[in-house]
Each structure stands twice: as structure tokens, then as C-alpha cells.
């Protein structure tokens, strides 16, 4: 059913970002719940079949895949944005041109989809790697909260929330570097967009709540100690 919903989302929105996020998150949670690799393989197969079917009928997705193969080949048309992103990253080098000295305005939608390009240009590979390391720590702590949760619902919820952030970072980083097609997903807590920022902060609040519950000492039940004593006296 989730596969069908994801396909409908791709067909209606003519974009595979939200569908990819939904399907990959659910697939990961199914694996966490069952531990069965076969479900992962079946899910990946369905994802490949659905993605190929939508690719055949979506001109927008075909262009994005073409940009991955060779963005510079279409520099004057639909390859301009990813080409400028690659130029910005290469211009940044290892240490960047300096905070505030870059030209993110040359990359269309740099404040949203391509925010990592602006960071890479001004802070270089070192600065961009530091940002990604912070996200990695955040994701790791999310999975740690999942392992520490005391009930199965909390474990699955925390794992799914951490996986949502991980998928977004992986897909966005691959997209801005032209290793993956751009999906329209935003960089959590950084890209412009009120609804995305609000959703990610709600996600963060849920993770903090689960972590707090896991670290809270177990409540002492005095009645549990009285019952055996009462039974012994009787």
C-alpha cells in the first residue's frame, strides 16, 4: 500500500522527493521492526520498478537524471543550476573563499535546495564536512535514543525520525554534488521553507521526548512491595 501511495505522490507532484522520503522511511522502519533482509530487497525492487515507470512518463525526472549523467552538456538549458552548483563547490576548494565572500546568488534557489553549495563555497570542503559531521552526530544520537527506548513503539518512532533526517541529508548531499538526481528535499534546519523547518523541529521535539523518557529513572511502585508481604501475613 505504501508503494502505491508513493507512486501516486510521484505521479501527482511530478517529483520523486516526497515519495522517496516516505517509502524509504517506511521501508527502514519495517526492517527495524522485523529484521528481515528479504523485506528490504522486495522494497528496493518495488522502488526501482516504480521509479522507472514514473521516469518513462515524467519529462522533469528525465531531465534531472540527465543532469546526473552530464550536467555540463545542458548548461544553457536545464543543466544550468547543477552546473553552477559544481562550479561553486569547486571554487570553494578545501577552506572556502571566506564567510560572506561567496556568490550563492549565481546558483538558482541557493537558499533552499542548494544551501549546501553556499556553505561549500564559503567554508570549503572542511566547513561542509564539519556541517555533515554535525548532522551525523544528530542522526547517531537519534538511533541511540531508539535503542534506549523502553517500549517498541518508542523504538520504532525514534528510529523512523532519525532515518528521516538521514535520508534527507543523504539525498540532498548527493543531489547538490550531481551524484544523485535532485529531488526537491530540503536540508533539515537550514533550507528556507516554513513548513519544512516546522516539521523538522517537531521531529526534533519528539526525539528529545523519547530520549528524556528513556533516561528517566523507573517509577518506584510501593504497592508492588506490599502485596507479597500482605500475602505472607495472611
Descriptions of predicted regions:
Residues 180-223:
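Transmembrane alpha-helices of multi-pass inner-membrane enzymes
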Residues 21-22, 100-105, 134, 177-186, ...:
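Re-entrant/interfacial helical elements at transmembrane boundaries that shape
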Residues 15-20, 96-99, 110-112, 125, ...:
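Transmembrane helix boundary and interhelical junction motifs in multipass membrane proteins
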Residues 77, 81, 107-115, 181:
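Juxtamembrane loop-helix boundary motifs flanking transmembrane segments in multi-pass membrane proteins
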Residues 89-126, 146-149, 153:
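Long extracytoplasmic/lumenal interhelical loops at the membrane interface
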Residues 9-10, 91, 179, 186:
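Residue-level marker of motif borders
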Residues 1-78, 117-177, 202-206, 221-234:
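Hydrophobic alpha-helical transmembrane segments of multi-pass inner membrane proteins, especially
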Amino acid at each position: 500500500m505504501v508503494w502505491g501511495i508513493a507512486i501516486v505522490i510521484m505521479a501527482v507532484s511530478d517529483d520523486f522527493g516526497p515519495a522517496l522520503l516516505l517509502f524509504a522511511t517506511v521501508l527502514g522502519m519495517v526492517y527495524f521492526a522485523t529484521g528481515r533482509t528479504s523485506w528490504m530487497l522486495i522494497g528496493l525492487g518495488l522502488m526501482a520498478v516504480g521509479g522507472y515507470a514514473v521516469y518513462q512518463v515524467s519529462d522533469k525526472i528525465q531531465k534531472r537524471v540527465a543532469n546526473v549523467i552530464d550536467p555540463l552538456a545542458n548548461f544553457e538549458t536545464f543543466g544550468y543550476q547543477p552546473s553552477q552548483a559544481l562550479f561553486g563547490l569547486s571554487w570553494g576548494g578545501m577552506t572556502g573563499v571566506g564567510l560572506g565572500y561567496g556568490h550563492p546568488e549565481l546558483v538558482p534557489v541557493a537558499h533552499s535546495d542548494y544551501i549546501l553549495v553556499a556553505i561549500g563555497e564559503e567554508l570549503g570542503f572542511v566547513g561542509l564536512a564539519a556541517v555533515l559531521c554535525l548532522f551525523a552526530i544528530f542522526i547517531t544520537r537519534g538511533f541511540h535514543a531508539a535503542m534506549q527506548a523502553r517500549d517498541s513503539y518508542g523504538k520504532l518512532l525514534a528510529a523512523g525520525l532519525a532515518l528521516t533526517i538521514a535520508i534527507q541529508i543523504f539525498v540532498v548531499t548527493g543531489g547538490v554534488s550531481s551524484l544523485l538526481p535532485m529531488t526537491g528535499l530540503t536540508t533539515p534546519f537550514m533550507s528556507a521553507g516554513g513548513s519544512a523547518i516546522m516539521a523538522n523541529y517537531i521531529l526534533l521535539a519528539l526525539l528529545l521526548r523519547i530520549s528524556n523518557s528513556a533516561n528517566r529513572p523507573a517509577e518506584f511502585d510501593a504497592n508492588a512491595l506490599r502485596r507479597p508481604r500482605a500475602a505472607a501475613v495472611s
